[in-house]
């Protein structure tokens, strides 16, 4: 039995998230498993580094699978991409030993959230960015983003239905910056709670709209109550861009993305 790690890029527009759902509900995981199973001529189960909500995208979702099938790495990639829908693509594949696990060996995960801040919605970026037409106080949002760095109890910033056993997470960085008409939130942590990034972005957007001051974030943390924070930002602008592992696994590091923004690494 051989274990493979794979890097996957996908648009989440047509899917109910990464994880396999009930029959008849499209998911990224199930779509890829179906294709890999045909290539391997045996059932394949993918284990992803994380889960994404419906409508959320990824530029480098890492997953692994085990198989008895013998194929060159190029054969797996070419075979899968020729059969996958155009909104899912295998970017790389690598043979691994059994010690590797896409989820449990990950040391950190990283997301970017993209806002298009302009008077009119962008037709060509439909469901690839979140459109905000109001003028935002960007400098205030930039300062507020740093409030989320460090180790905190993120109870206020997770979904009410989040199933994680405990809400404490360490955020290595949480940076917001301008890129033309785009605002980009770049956040890396040892792990994320359900809706955590979208709830943080929702908070920053409300601060940018003048609904409350930066220091109010402290009160939100202290409340440890989802009702103490504001909106959950839409899934459209959210991208899973990287998963980090110990150097011993020597996985590829493709450009972070989203590629059409041409952002610095």
Swiss-Prot record:
Signal peptide: none annotated. The lineage of its organism: Bacteria, Pseudomonadati, Pseudomonadota, Gammaproteobacteria, Moraxellales. The keyword Manganese does not apply. PANTHER family: PSEUDOURIDYLATE SYNTHASE, TRNA PSEUDOURIDINE SYNTHASE-LIKE 1. The active site is at residue 53. CDD domains: PseudoU_synth_EcTruA (cd02570). This is tRNA pseudouridine synthase A. GO terms for molecular function: RNA binding; tRNA pseudouridine(38-40) synthase activity. Substrate binds at residue 111. Keywords: Isomerase, tRNA processing. Its EC number is 5.4.99.12. Belongs to the tRNA pseudouridine synthase TruA family. It catalyses: uridine(38/39/40) in tRNA = pseudouridine(38/39/40) in tRNA. Homodimer. SUPFAM superfamilies: Pseudouridine synthase. It comes from Acinetobacter baumannii (strain ATCC 17978 / DSM 105126 / CIP 53.77 / LMG 1025 / NCDC KC755 / 5377). Formation of pseudouridine at positions 38, 39 and 40 in the anticodon stem and loop of transfer RNAs. GO terms for biological process: tRNA pseudouridine synthesis.
